[in-house]
From Swiss-Prot:
Source organism superkingdom: Bacteria
Organism: Trichormus variabilis (strain ATCC 29413 / PCC 7937)
InterPro entries named among the record's database cross-references: Enolase, Enolase-like_C_sf, Enolase-like_N, Enolase_C, Enolase_CS, Enolase_N
Binding site residues for Mg(2+): D247, E288, D315
PROSITE patterns linked: ENOLASE
Name of the protein this chain belongs to: Enolase
Length: 429
C-alpha cells in the first residue's frame, strides 16, 4: 500500500512541444517525492465539436501563426502547480476537481483544457509508476483485460484531408480476429493491399493527418467499394472477418438545415435514407456523427431507422460531456459515444462519462485526435475501461502506430488473461 508521503506531488513542469501536424501542444511532468515521474502529452483536433472544452492558444501571430501554447504552459507552471504540490497523486479526483475549481469556468476557458488535461494524465501516470503497475491496471484494476477492436481509418476525407471526399473517415474493422495481434496484422495487410488497389486505378496514395490514404474519389460509395475490394484481395471476408465503419462528420457539411454532399444540398430525411442505403449495401457496423451536432430530432429518426442494425456514435454530438450524453440517452439519440480526453479536459470527467454511457447501454469508443503525439494513454484507457473499441488512425505514421504497439505489449503482459473484444462479441455492432 502506498504511503501518502511517497506519493505526494513534489513538482510539476510543463513545456511546449510539437504534435504530429507540426503545431504546438503541451507536455507535462508530475514528479512525486518517491522519485516516480509521470509524463503526458495532449492532442488536438481538426474537426472539433462546438461544445468541446476550450483549448487555450496564445493567438500571438509572431509565433506559430498564433497557435502557440505558452499561456497554457504558464498556467500549469505558475497557477496549477503551486496549488497541487503536496497533494496525493493517487487521489485523481481531488487533483482534477482542484484544477477545475481553479479554472472556474464551465468549459476550462480560463486556464485551458489542454493545460488541465496534461497535468491530469501526468498525475495518473505518476501514480501508476509509484505503485509499480501499468496505467491500465492502475485505472481499471484486475478486470482490465479486454483488448479493443480497432476501427482503422484507412481512407481520409473531409477536414482530415485535402481531397474532394465528403465523409471524414472510412475505416476497416477486424471483427473476426481471435486476438489483438491478429486483428492488427489483418488491418495492416488490408492497408497494404489498399495501396496496391489505389495504385492500380491510378489514384494517389498520399496520406492524410491520420495516416489514411487521401485520393480524390467520385463519391463516398466509391471509397466503400475500394475498401471491400482491398479486403477481398487481401484474402479476407468483408463483414464476417473485416467490417467497415464511417465517420461522416456531418456537422462539417451541414449548411442552412441541409446536408451538402455529392455536390448538392439534401434534406435531412433524404440524408438519413442515404445512410440507411449504405448500411443495406455494405458491411458497415458503425457510423459516427451521421448528423449535425445540434440536429437532435433527426438523430432520433436515424437511431429509429438503423440503430438496431448498426452502432451510431456521437462525437461532436456528445463531446465526451456527461450532460450532453444524458440528453442523448433521454432522447434516444445514438447508441454509442466517442471518448476523446481533450474534449472534456480531465481524466476524472472522462471516466464519469464512460461510466454513464455503460450504465445506460451506450458503448464507448476510445479515440485519438487528428493532431496526435507519441503519448499512448488512450491504449491503456481502452483496456482499463473495457471499452472494447479504439480509434487511433491508420497503419502508418508513428504517432498512430505507437498506440497499436502499446496494445500489443499490454496483450503480451496479460498473457492468457487477455481477451480480444471482437472474439467475444464486444466490438461494434
Amino acid at each position: 500500500m502506498s504511503n501518502i508521503v511517497d506519493t505526494a506531488i513534489e513538482a510539476i513542469v510543463a513545456r511546449e512541444i510539437l504534435d504530429s501536424r507540426g503545431r504546438p501542444t503541451i507536455e507535462a511532468e508530475v514528479h512525486l517525492l518517491s522519485g516516480a515521474v509521470g509524463l503526458a502529452q495532449v492532442p488536438s483536433g481538426a474537426s472539433t465539436g462546438t461544445f468541446e472544452a476550450h483549448e487555450l492558444r496564445d493567438k500571438d501571430k509572431s509565433r506559430y501563426g498564433g497557435k502557440g501554447v505558452l499561456k497554457a504552459v504558464h498556467n500549469v507552471n505558475e497557477v496549477l502547480a503551486p496549488k497541487l504540490i503536496d497533494l496525493d497523486a493517487i487521489n485523481q479526483e481531488l487533483i482534477d476537481r482542484t484544477m477545475i475549481a481553479l479554472d472556474g469556468s464551465g468549459n476550462k476557458s480560463n486556464l485551458g483544457a489542454n493545460a488541465i488535461l496534461a497535468v491530469s494524465l501526468a498525475a495518473a501516470r505518476a501514480g501508476a509508476a509509484s505503485l509499480g503497475i501499468p496505467l491500465y491496471r492502475y485505472l481499471g484494476g484486475p478486470l482490465a483485460n479486454l483488448l479493443p477492436v480497432p476501427l482503422m481509418n484507412v481512407i481520409n476525407g473531409g477536414a482530415h484531408a485535402a481531397n474532394n471526399v465528403d465523409f471524414q473517415e472510412f475505416m476497416i474493422v477486424p471483427v473476426g480476429a481471435t486476438s489483438f495481434r491478429e486483428a492488427l496484422r489483418w488491418g495492416a495487410e488490408v492497408f497494404a493491399t489498399l495501396s496496391e488497389v489505389l495504385h492500380d486505378k491510378g489514384l494517389l496514395t498520399g496520406v492524410g493527418d491520420e495516416g489514411g490514404f487521401a485520393p480524390n474519389l467520385e463519391s463516398n460509395q466509391v471509397a466503400l467499394e475500394l475498401l471491400v475490394a482491398a479486403i477481398e484481395k487481401a484474402g479476407y471476408k468483408p463483414g464476417e472477418q473485416v467490417a467497415l465503419a464511417l465517420d461522416v462528420a456531418a456537422s462539417e457539411f451541414y449548411k442552412e438545415g441541409q446536408y451538402v454532399y455529392d455536390g448538392r444540398p439534401h434534406a435531412p430525411t433524404e440524408f438519413i435514407d442515404y445512410l440507411g442505403q449504405l448500411v443495406d449495401q455494405y458491411p458497415i457496423v458503425s457510423i459516427e456523427d451521421g448528423l449535425h451536432e445540434e440536429d437532435w430530432q433527426n438523430w432520433q429518426l436515424l437511431t429509429q431507422k438503423v440503430g438496431s442494425r448498426v452502432q451510431l456514435v456521437g462525437d461532436d454530438l456528445f463531446v465526451t460531456n456527461a450532460t450532453r450524453l444524458q440528453k442523448g440517452i433521454q432522447e434516444k439519440a445514438g447508441n454509442a459515444i466517442l471518448i476523446k480526453l481533450n474534449q472534456i479536459g480531465s481524466l476524472t470527467e472522462t471516466l464519469e462519462t464512460i461510466d454513464l454511457g455503460t450504465r445506460n447501454g451506450f458503448r464507448s469508443v476510445i479515440s485519438h485526435r487528428s493532431g496526435e503525439t507519441e503519448d499512448t494513454t488512450i491504449a491503456d484507457l481502452a483496456v482499463a475501461t473495457r471499452a472494447g473499441q479504439i480509434k487511433t488512425g491508420s497503419l502508418c505514421r508513428s504517432e498512430r502506430v505507437a498506440k497499436y504497439n502499446r496494445l500489443l505489449r499490454i496483450e503480451d503482459e496479460l498473457g492468457d488473461r487477455a481477451v480480444y473484444a471482437g472474439a467475444v462479441g464486444l466490438g461494434p455492432k
